[in-house]
Structure formats: structure tokens, C-alpha cells
């Protein structure tokens, strides 16, 4: 059996992040399940969610656009941070951490905070 080599490029994390936002906007639940870890930790303002099931209980599709974001990798952990825009206004700063599992990037932590604070 030939194993696929681990993906180690910042470009792959960027593609994963864009796929996540597209799936979020289009209600592509199977894609969201593929990209978000079952044990994801999510912090949005004062709301803390633990696990993918908790996320899906509050999920509503919306369109967000990444603006000015960076990607870093250290071994099997990568992270992206920057701003998310909605209707051309900065809505949140975002930090999204990813960890490779079975040679795929999975979202394991999301932190969104109000850009006006």
C-alpha cells in the first residue's frame, strides 16, 4: 500500500480555509463534516462550543470573505489568522488552527472576536 505523503504547504491550508468558507456559505454539510474535527473547540464572542455537533446546532449559512490573512505551519500543526469581512465591513478577527489527521488538514480550533474591541 502506497501512503500519500503529508501535505506541508501553506497553500494547502489556504485552500482548506477557502473550502471551509465556501461550504459554510452553501450549506455543504458533508464538506463541513470533512473539514471540521469532531472535537473542534470554537469560541465566538462570549459563546464557547465544544465539538462539531454543538457547532451544527447553531449553524446558519452566511457569506464571509477572508481579508488579509496569514498562514503558518509547524510540523503537523498549522494556523491561519486575519480578518473576516461581511458586507465589506470587518466583522471579526479570526484565528483558525488546523492539525493534519490522516494527511488532511482538519479544523480543530476556531476563535472569532469582535473587530471593534
How would you describe each model-predicted region?
Residues 20, 32, 40, 55, ...:
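Hydrophobic pocket/interface hotspot
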Residues 36, 84-86, 111:
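Short beta-strand segments enriched in hydrophobic/aromatic residues
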Residues 14, 33-69:
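Short solvent-exposed beta->alpha transition segments
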Residues 42, 71, 110-112:
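Hydrophobic/anchoring residues in structured secondary elements
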Residues 1-26, 30, 34, 38:
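Short, low-complexity N-terminal intrinsically disordered segments enriched in polar/charged residues
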Residues 53-96:
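Surface-exposed, charged secondary-structure patches
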Residues 90-117:
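Short beta-strand edge/turn micro-motifs at domain boundaries
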Amino acid at each position: 500500500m502506497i501512503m500519500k505523503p503529508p501535505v506541508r504547504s501553506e497553500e494547502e491550508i489556504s485552500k482548506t480555509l477557502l473550502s471551509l468558507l465556501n461550504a459554510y456559505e452553501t450549506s455543504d454539510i458533508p464538506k463541513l463534516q470533512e473539514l471540521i474535527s469532531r472535537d473542534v473547540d470554537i469560541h465566538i464572542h462570549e459563546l464557547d462550543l465544544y465539538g462539531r455537533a454543538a457547532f451544527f446546532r447553531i449553524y446558519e449559512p452566511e457569506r464571509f470573505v477572508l481579508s488579509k490573512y496569514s498562514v503558518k505551519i509547524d510540523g503537523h500543526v498549522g494556523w491561519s489568522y486575519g480578518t473576516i469581512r461581511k458586507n465589506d465591513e470587518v466583522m471579526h478577527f479570526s484565528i483558525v488552527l488546523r492539525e493534519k489527521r490522516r494527511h488532511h488538514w482538519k479544523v480543530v480550533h476556531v476563535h472569532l472576536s469582535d473587530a471593534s474591541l
